[in-house]
């Protein structure tokens, strides 16, 4: 808690994947963890009760979410690969309007080469195939959104990849 408070009003988060720390201020006076409920009510000193981990938004504001793979080889040795289609496997849940996510394909020409954003495409609930263009020896895929009330679950990342010669 802060120096002027007798109750918890600060938080510290360490993100192991991104190797960074986050700090902030959020007063909490009680926490009820029933063990069988998926809703976690939390009391505050301002006489509000919050339900944590409910919905897809941040108290009425859009909450950004993303999933990003590590680099993976798309072709062995000296050969490049050409990625020409993305076949999305994504389920939108509890979303309002026309939900969508953005797929970004990042490529490298070599293991120590610069990571380049090669192709970006938007995928909605009715998208069956997205035609894209990306070329490299290694690829990384990022799926993200920052829309209000947009819940989604990612399945397999399916790409149409062809051998594309040397350079």
Question: PLM ranges: what are they?
Answer:
Residues 1-167:
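Beta-sheet repeat architectures centered on beta-propellers
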């Amino acid at each position: 808690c802060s120096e002027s408070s007798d109750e918890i009003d600060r938080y510290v988060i360490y993100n192991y994947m991104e190797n960074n720390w986050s700090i902030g201020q959020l007063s909490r006076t009680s926490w009820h963890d029933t063990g069988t409920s998926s809703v976690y009510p939390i009391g505050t000193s301002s006489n509000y009760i919050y339900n944590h981990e409910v919905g897809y938004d941040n108290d009425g504001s859009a909450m950004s979410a993303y999933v990003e793979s590590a680099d993976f080889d798309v072709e062995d040795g000296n050969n490049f690969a050409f990625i020409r289609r993305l076949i999305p496997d994504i389920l939108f849940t509890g979303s309002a309007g026309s939900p969508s996510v953005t797929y970004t394909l990042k490529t490298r020409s070599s293991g120590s080469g610069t990571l380049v954003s090669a192709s970006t495409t938007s995928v909605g609930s009715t998208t069956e195939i997205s035609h894209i263009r990306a070329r490299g020896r290694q690829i990384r895929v990022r799926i993200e959104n920052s829309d209000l009330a947009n819940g989604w679950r990612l399945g397999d990342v399916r790409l149409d990849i062809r051998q594309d010669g040397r350079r």
